[in-house]
Amino acid sequence: MKVSQFFLATVKETPADAVLASHQLMIRAGMLRKLASGLYTWLPLGLRVLQKVADVVREEMNRAGALELLMPIVQPASLWQESGRWEAYGAELLRIMDRHQNGFCFGPTHEEVITDIARQELKSYKQLPLNFYQIQTKFRDEIRPRFGVMRSREFLMKDAYSFDLDEKGMQAAYEKMFDAYRRIFTRLGLNFRAVLADTGAIGGDYSHEFQVLADVGEDTVVYSDESDYAANIEKAAAQAPQGERVKPVAEIKKIATPGVRTIKQLADKANILPEKGVKTLIVKGDESSLIALILRGDHELNDVKAQHLPGVAFPLQFADEKEIREAIGCGPGSLGPVNLPIPFIVDRDAAQLVDFSCGANEDDFHWINVNWERDVPLGSVADIRKVVEGDISPDGKGRLRFARGIEVGQVFQLGDKYSRKMNATVVDELGKSRYLQMGCYGIGVSRTVAAAIEQNHDERGIIWPTPMAPFFIALVPVNMHKSYRVREACEKLYNELIDAGYEVLWDDRKERPGVMFADMDLIGIPHRLVISESGLDRGIVEYKARKSKEAENVSLENVLSVFR
C-alpha cells in the first residue's frame, strides 16, 4: 500500500480530553476520531488493527470448535423481562420504543437472545455440546465514558455461549474456552494474567477475567509471590485469622469524644491504634431493612463481597445519615455493635479483636476495651474486607502482591441461570427434560487494541506487537521525487516484499525524511527500511526495528533475509 493511496491521518496535537497514552496515540496516529461522548469512528489505519485482533480471535474460536453466527444488535424487551434483567441491569441498558410502542434495547450482551435460539432449536441431548460465538458491536450507556475506546459506549466484542447437558460438560467447555483465551492473548503478544473474578451483572457461579497488566489499569490484580493464585481484588479472599481469640484484659469504658467522626480521629483522641478499633457501616437489606457491617478500623469494605451476603441488597446500597439516625439515633461517625438495634455482620479479622474501641451509638461518645461475647454478642461472621498487600495468600503460599490491570476478557460458568428462567430444556437419554447448562465468554476486541498500546509505546508513538500491526514493513525513500534511482529501487523492493507476502506501507509522499520517519514511528510499524542515494552507492538499505533505538545497514540483495 502506498501512502498516496491510503488515508494517513496523523496529527501533532493531543486532544484535551485524552488522558491515557492509548487514547492520545490512537487519535494522533489517525486510528480514531470522536463522534460523540463514548462514540468513535475507526479510520482505515485503526480498522486494520481492529481486524487483525478479530482475525486472531476468530481463528482460535474456530480451533476450539465454536460456531460463528450473528445476532441482532436490537433486542426485544420481552426477552430481558423473562430473564429478570430488564430492570436489574440498570441504566447502562439503552432502552428504546419502536413506532408501535414495543420495547427494545441495544444489546450490551446476548445471553437472552442466544438462550431463546437454544430453546427453539435444541431438543435432544444428541445435539450437544454446542458453542456459538459472534464478533459484533455492543452498546452500554456508560455514565461517564472516558479513556477513548478503553471505556466507550459502543465497542466491538466477541461473545460466545456454550450449551451442555450437565455441569461436567459445562466445566469442560469452560476449560476449552479458558485455554483458547490464553492462546489468543499470547498470540497477540500481550503480558496478561488470568484471575478469579466476580460474575457481576452476567451472573453465574464461577468466573475468570483476563487482565492485561498496565499501570493505568482500572482494576487491581492480586497475586501470590510464591504460587499461581491470582484474583481481581473484588474476588480476592482474605485468609481467616489463625488461632483462638485471646481473653479480655481491660474493663469496658464509655468515653466522651466530641467531634470525633473517624477512626483516625478516635485513634488520636484515645491514643489507640486504628487496628484496635472497629468501624460500622450501614447498608440496605433485601426488604427495606438495614444491616450493619463491622470491620477492623484499618480495613476497607469489599463492596462485591458485601453485596453477596445473605439479606444484603444487590447491588450494594449504603444508608444515608437520615436513615441511620431514624434507625439508631446517632450519626454515622458514632456507630458501633454494642446495643446496636439492627442485625450486623462482622468481618473475620474484626471478630478476632480484643479490648477494641467502637462508637457508642450516641453522638460524641465511644466505647473502649470492648470484647465480643462479654460485652456484645458476636453474631454472624464473614469475609467482607478488601485484602491488603502483604496479606498471606488464600492458598497459604506466599504473600499477596498488587498490580494494575485492564480487563480484556472474561469467562463465566452460568449453569442454568438463564435456561431455567427462560425454560430452555433438552431431553436426556432417559427421556427426562433437563435445563441446559450454559457458559458465556467475552473478549473486548476494541479494548484489547487500546490495552496493547498501553503496554507497547514510547515517546515517539506506538510499538505494535507484530500480530496486531496495521502493516509489517514501512518503506521510506529519501528524496525519491528528486532521484530516479531511489524511486526505481523502491519500486523493485516494494514489489519483492509484496510478492513475498509482507504487508508494506510505502511512504511515497513528497515530504522531508524527518516527517516520514516520525509518522512511521507514531503509527508503530514494526520494521522500517530506508532507501537513499548514499545507500544505493554502497549497495545497502538502512534497517531499523521499531522497538530498537539503533539502525543497521543491510545489503540490498539480502533485505528479505532480515524478515525470514
From Swiss-Prot:
GO biological process: prolyl-tRNA aminoacylation
Keyword Nucleotide-binding: yes
InterPro entries in UniProt: aa-tRNA-synt_IIb, aa-tRNA-synth_II, aa-tRNA-synth_II/BPL/LPL, Anticodon-bd, Anticodon-bd_dom_sf, Pro-tRNA-ligase_IIa, Pro-tRNA-synth_IIa_bac-type, Pro-tRNA-Synthase_IIa_type1
Catalytic reaction annotation: tRNA(Pro) + L-proline + ATP = L-prolyl-tRNA(Pro) + AMP + diphosphate
Localisation: Cytoplasm
Subunit (UniProt): Homodimer.
HAMAP family recorded: Pro_tRNA_synth_type1
Protein name: Proline--tRNA ligase
Organism encoding this protein: Coxiella burnetii (strain Dugway 5J108-111)
Gene behind the chain: proS
